[in-house]
UniProtKB/Swiss-Prot annotation:
Gene3D superfamilies: P-loop containing nucleotide triphosphate hydrolases. Present with 279 molecules/cell in log phase SD medium. Belongs to the helicase family. Yeast subtelomeric Y' repeat subfamily. Residues 375-552 form the Helicase ATP-binding domain. The lineage of its organism: Eukaryota, Fungi, Dikarya, Ascomycota, Saccharomycotina. Keywords: ATP-binding, Nucleotide-binding. A motif (DEAH box) lies at residues 498-501. SUPFAM superfamilies: P-loop containing nucleoside triphosphate hydrolases. Pfam families: DEAD, Sir1. The keyword Protein transport does not apply. ATP binds at A388, P389, P390, G391, Y392, G393, K394, T395. It comes from Saccharomyces cerevisiae (strain ATCC 204508 / S288c). GO terms for cellular component: mitochondrion. This is Uncharacterized helicase-like protein YBL111C. It comes from the Eukaryota.
Length: 667
């Protein structure tokens, strides 16, 4: 808003503007809520001058004694003439109303005053001392909540970009009172700016169930509690949905379009609007804050210990059946497995996916690769293991089906890929996300925030797969999705594990893999295990080590594909089908791999000769050297530094050191 436009707006919404600004006090009472709704507020300190008795603003040069006698107000700053500044403070019935929290050892009261006033537009909320321990968390962890709000606005931007023709988020927002622009088009460059403003509101909504501010609005009724709507309406300033601040305007169009994010963000409006307008016709709530807090916690993925309870919706038959069940059965963790509704699929989906990824000239390398890709995408085989040589195209065996799944408009599939080492993550994510065919993100995002509704494939390492937080989220997937997105069309797709033989061969890491046995494999559409060096004995032992049945007794050749029987028992109840593409006399057409087996007297010397020859011909190339022991890794790295720029890593390094090496490889 231009300075001239702002001054016109100030005068139009404050009838006594001229006379009030001629007041000698720096602090001036203003009854216009519209002015405070439309112009950014700030918190300033004021004091009463002993000599003149006037209210003056505390400036940097004001003496220490004046600051000690000061008090704080939420104000709108206005300019009188060229160099004179006045501050307007909002008042209702009482002049110079002072409300808000009591002093705290954690926070100065102005911060909470500003947060509560801006979010709820309420002047009568009171906090007790216990609330300060909760409210202080925002300022102690502000960076964390800032990042959460950034991601919420990024989600808004993604939705708006996908629907530029009907989304008001890509147009200029206009204040419905003054008709002047408030926020221009939401852009990537402004997400962080607005995210900082959204963070306090998000914090309050996430923690509102821990605060005492709404406890006074509970009216006891026979057998249950209900919101005292009359008292709430007296305390809350009546606002229209269109008079909210810009963070709610951002999602206004999406709410009209019934978008999932907008539906969740609408809880911010419900807090400030009249709750339960018609009393008896509205649903009865345990607490006013419970619904709001629950919805936000679920959508933002902060419910690591959350388990949905459907006890309130169970019918009489369910209760009787539950009481009749044996105690032994009750102690077991029951897994609900069922036939999943299959979306229409065809072999043409794979061909279309290949052309998206590689261009119109795409062709499969051989018939084996074609048939196995169709097996993974089309067949009901719940668990598949593939052994193929390096360079054969194992990645495409699941990459193309994932792209085909992502093309299904009536269902959203979320898949997971796990690799053994951190150093493989960056390149893997780049490869799988090229050409924008898939939305790829780290598994750490899923663990920390939950499903964002946008990502098609999460990529992580074995440690992520074994973590308790990951297994808990998968176990509660269907309940969380149903509560968060209010649909069953967001499904778990593939669980893909690369180089799965490491579960058996890496003895020193086996203690880290124990948590994988707690994973609910039945929740996934299909499990895919890949390796270049996993003979049947190793593959069978590796699968059993993570809690699966193991390989089918009879090894399946690639030419013996057939559909499996009914899947009602779940993925973990069936043996894994093994497809071996490495045969003694087969000639697999590898596109870019040249393999040589050599017996030499000194392996390090021979390896050094090969590397020197390689970099002489191709100076920009890179090479990976695998050593048999950790000591040999460090020795080779030290001795070869005079020839090459070396980045080295082995399993005994800590996470921090691995991260440094990972960055070095990416660089």
């Amino acid at each position: 808003m231009k300075v001239s436009d702002r001054r016109k707006f100030e005068k139009a919404n404050f009838d006594e503007f001229e006379s009030a600004l001629n007041n000698k006090n720096d602090l001036v009472h203003c009854p216009s809520i519209t002015l405070f709704e439309s112009i950014p507020t700030e918190v300033r300190s004021f004091y009463e001058d002993e000599k003149s008795g006037l209210i003056k603003v505390v400036k940097f040069r004001t003496g220490a004694m004046d600051r000690k006698r000061s008090f704080e107000k939420i104000v709108v700053s206005v300019m009188v003439g060229k160099n004179v500044q006045k501050f307007l403070t909002f008042v209702e019935d009482e002049p110079d109303f002072q409300g808000g929290p009591i002093p705290s050892k954690y926070l100065i009261p102005k911060k909470i005053n500003l947060m509560v006033y801006t979010l709820f537009q309420v002047h009568t909320l009171k906090f007790n001392r216990k609330d300060y321990d909760t409210l202080s968390l925002f300022y102690l962890n502000r960076g964390y909540y800032n990042e959460l709000s950034f991601r919420v606005l990024e989600r808004c931007y993604e939705i708006a970009s996908a629907r530029p023709n009907d989304s008001s988020t890509m147009r200029t927002f206009t204040d419905f009172v003054s008709g002047t622009p408030i926020v221009r088009s939401l852009q990537k460059s402004t997400i962080r700016k607005y995210g900082y403003n959204l963070a306090p509101y998000m914090f309050l909504l996430l923690h509102v169930d821990e605060l005492s501010i709404f406890s006074a609005y509970q009216a006891s009724l026979p057998g249950e509690k209900k919101v005292d709507t009359e008292r709430l309406k007296r305390d809350l300033c009546p606002r229209k949905p269109t008079e909210i601040k810009y963070f709610s305007q951002i999602c206004n169009d999406m709410m009209n379009k019934k978008d999932r994010l907008g539906d969740v963000l609408a809880t911010a409006q419900r807090i400030r609007r009249r709750y339960n307008k018609n009393g008896s016709s509205e649903p009865r709530l345990k607490t006013l804050d419970g619904l709001t807090s629950e919805r936000w916690i679920q959508w933002l993925g902060l419910e690591s210990d959350y388990h949905c309870s459907f006890s309130s919706t169970r019918n009489a038959e369910d209760v009787v059946a539950g009481e009749a069940a044996s105690s032994d059965h009750d102690q077991k963790i029951s897994r609900v497995t069922r036939k999943r509704p299959r979306e229409p699929k065809s072999t043409n989906d794979i061909l279309v996916a290949g052309r998206k990824l590689f261009g119109s000239s795409f062709e499969f390398r051989d018939l084996h690769q074609l048939r196995l890709c169709h097996e993974i995408y089309m067949a009901d085989t719940p668990s598949v293991a593939v052994q193929a040589p390096p360079g054969y195209g194992k990645t495409e065996l699941f990459h193309l089906p994932l792209i085909a799944l992502a093309s299904k408009g009536d269902v959203k599939y979320v898949s997971f890929l796990f690799v053994p080492y951190t150093v493989l993550l960056a390149n893997c994510m780049i490869r799988l996300g090229r050409r924008g065919c898939l939305n790829v993100a780290p598994v750490r995002n899923f663990i920390e925030e939950g499903c964002d509704g946008v990502t098609d494939l999460y990529v992580g390492i074995y440690d992520d797969l074994a973590s308790t937080n990951f297994t808990d989220r998968i176990a509660a997937w269907e309940n969380i999705v149903e509560c968060t997105f209010r649909t069953n069309n967001v499904k778990l797709g593939y669980l893909i594990v690369d180089e799965f033989h490491n579960f058996e061969t890496e003895v020193y890491r086996q203690s880290q893999f124990g948590g994988i046995t707690n994973l609910d494999f039945d929740a996934f559409e299909k499990a895919i295990f890949l390796s270049g060096t996993a003979p049947e004995a190793v593959a069978d032992a590796a699968l059993q080590r993570i809690g699966l049945t193991g390989l089918a007794k009879k090894s399946m050749d690639i030419n013996e594909l057939k559909r499996s029987e009914d899947l009602s028992r779940g993925l973990s109840s069936y043996p894994t089908r093994m497809f071996n593409l490495i045969k003694e006399k087969s000639e697999v057409p590898l596109g870019h791999v040249h393999k040589i087996w050599k017996k030499v007297e000194s392996q390090p010397e021979e390896a050094l000769k090969l590397l020197l020859a390689l970099f002489e011909i191709e100076p920009e190339s890179k090479a990976i050297v695998v050593a048999s022991t950790t000591n040999e890794v460090e020795e080779l790295a030290c001795s070869w530094r005079k020839y090459f720029r070396v980045v080295w890593i082995h399993g005994k390094l800590g996470c921090c050191r691995k991260g440094v090496s990972h960055k070095g490889v990416c660089h």
